[in-house]
Structures are given as C-alpha cells and as structure tokens.
UniProtKB/Swiss-Prot annotation:
One Pfam assignment: IMS_C
Boundaries of every UmuC domain copy: 1-68
Biological process per Gene Ontology, one example term: error-prone translesion synthesis
Database matches in PROSITE patterns: UMUC
Protein encoded by which gene: yobH
Name of protein: DNA repair protein homolog YobH
InterPro entries the record matches: DNA/RNA_pol_sf (IPR043502), DNA_pol_Y-fam_lit_finger_sf (IPR036775), DNA_pol_Y-fam_little_finger (IPR017961), DNA_polymerase-Y (IPR050116), IMS_HHH_1 (IPR053848), Rev_trsase/Diguanyl_cyclase (IPR043128), UmuC (IPR001126)
PANTHER family in the record: DNA REPAIR POLYMERASE UMUC / TRANSFERASE FAMILY MEMBER, DNA REPAIR PROTEIN HOMOLOG YOBH
Length: 217
C-alpha cells in the first residue's frame, strides 16, 4: 500500500513522498518524521514493541512530535532530556505540572495515542474525550473551528451511543513546534447535562475565542 501511494503520487503529481506506518496515528507520524526520510525506500514502520528501542532514544526532546522548545526547556529543568526518561517519569507529577498536556506527554512517550477513538471505555467511566493530531499547521480560524466541530460531534456521538449526558466540558489546544509549543486548557460546568453536538461546540468555541492567541495549531 505504501509503495502504491508513492507510485501514485509520482505518476499523478511528479512528487516523491515518504510514508510513515504505525500501530496508531502517533507512531505513524513519528515513523514519518524520524525515520522514513532516512531510508532508501522512503518508508518506515513503527510498532508498539519498537517504542523502547526507537522512541525512547530520541533526543533532544524537541525532535518528538508535540514538544516545542519551551516545553523542552521545562522538561530539561525537571531532569528529563530523553523520551525514555519522560516515559519513566511519574504520571501524577507530569499532570500536576502541565495538566492535560502532562497526561498526553506521558502516554505519547509510551507510544500510546488515543486520538482516533478516544480513551477506552472503562468500568464506571463517566467521561468521553477525543484528541486529534494535525498533520500540518492550521492558522486560519475557520479551519480550526471546523476541526473543533468535528471533534465535538465525535464526542457527542459517543455519549449518545452510550445514552450518557455530561455537564463539564473541557478543551485543550497545543501550539505548533514552530511556536515553541505551549497552548491552553480550560473547563466549564454548564447548567444542564447534554450530549448535543452544538451545545458542546458552543462551549468549546467560547474557550477558543477567549483564549486562542493566534498561534499555529
């Protein structure tokens, strides 16, 4: 399939391309960024079992997707200079320091990405979430709003599937590595429980309009 994509790109557009393949979107992105461009075939594949030998050796930390220069400096001050050290750092301390971004950093360091289907439903779980990796920088507000709407629809759909409603809505946005990372995370508890897409979207849009700094996503 990867070779077929490369052949199609060359045949239709005259462009050579590299391909990253992984057990999830994160690993495929890392395979693309960190290895595929160095191979003769332009193709690289990363599996979960490759994480200790490939991902954990990555340094500086800013080579890791989602870690900008500012975040790298913060982690360095905590004694973390490799992805392996990040993976072994206590999750609760990362969450205390960075909030939801700390949670994402920890699981990404283990090669775990929940962006496609959200967190697995556990016994007694009463929350639904979805994160999404953007494979290019988004700078236009209307583009970002479209992505937000898609995410809200997925979360609302899952809530409706399980016949659940919720009152607390959270939105976290991380900025591009070109912007030295960073971002924001905000939560709000609304008056009435909902699983309606537009109710969730309006709340997230309020966060976006109030806290988005105009940096690349």
């Amino acid at each position: 399939m990867a070779k077929a994509i490369q052949s199609s790109m060359w045949r239709e557009f005259g462009l050579m391309c590299t391909v990253g393949i992984g057990d999830n979107m994160l690993l495929s992105k890392l395979a693309l960024d960190l290895e595929s461009k160095k191979t003769k075939s332009g193709i690289a594949r990363w599996r979960y079992e490759d994480v200790p030998n490939r991902l954990w050796k990555v340094r500086p930390l800013s080579k890791m997707w989602g870690i900008g220069g500012r975040m790298e400096r913060n982690l360095n001050r905590m004694g973390i200079s490799t992805v392996g050290q990040l993976a072994k750092f206590p999750l609760e301390l990362l969450e205390k320091k960075f909030g939801i971004m700390g949670n994402q950093l920890y699981y990404h360091a283990h090669g775990i990405d929940l962006s496609e289907i959200g967190a697995p439903l556990m016994q007694g779980q009463i929350s639904f979430g979805k994160s999404q990796i953007l494979f290019r920088d988004y700078t236009k507000r209307e583009e970002i709003k479209a992505v937000l709407l898609e995410i809200c629809e997925e979360v609302a759909r899952r809530a409706r599937t399980y016949n659940k409603v919720g009152r607390t809505i959270s939105l976290g946005i991380g900025y591009s590595k070109d912007e030295l990372g960073g971002g924001f995370h905000r939560s709000k508890t609304i008056d009435f429980p909902t699983n309606i897409t537009m109710d969730i979207y309006k709340c997230c849009l309020m966060f976006f309009n109030k806290f988005y700094s105009g940096k690349k996503q």
